[in-house]
Amino acid sequence: MAEARAHFKERNPDYKSDYRPTRIVKETFPEVSYRARKQQGLSQKELFGIAQEKFQGVSLYGLEVSDEAFAAMESDTPLDILVSREDYLTLAEFLKNDPRTQMDYLIDVTAVDWKDHFDLIAQLMCSEKGHKIFLRLSLPKDDSIPEEKRAKSILASAPSLSKLYLGANWKEREVFDMFGIAFEGHDDLRRIFLDEDFPGYPLRKDFTHPHIISREG
């Protein structure tokens, strides 16, 4: 563009344009104070207390359990708890069936790839009352797989929620497809977006592909 402009000026030295860029008047608006959303259903502290009644091993993700930690949470922020692999399925079943929690809706199942483990995260919700919870499960990566085969291998597995929530069928297949995490007890565990022979798992940090444009700097 700059080269074309310079060429035009060279050929038309006396040309003058009447065009003037439009100046936009900047509007100012009064500052609006943040209004916290009204709490829906059970509070994070109430939910945590119910979960801890039968599962003493649960803990808050990234926080120490304290009144101050719960008080600092926004009312519409889902409770985020760490649960063991052994308790993951039974805790989800408990939260779904307990009349106080009634977490009958599975919003999502997703994962995060860390250096030596995956975080598997299931988000549940009570469709009647509105409270939500993240069940976060830490899955160590299988270190018995040779380095040269790891990028194209299943590195972790977890119990499937598909018998509890029909929606878990496709959501877990997506995690399997993108992260290479297997789900025990899933009746149709196969790739959902990519071909069965696709090499690797695109949302993992070890994924490589010849068409990936690397970022420099």
What residue spans do the PLM features occupy?
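Terminal low-complexity/charged segments
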Residues: 1-217
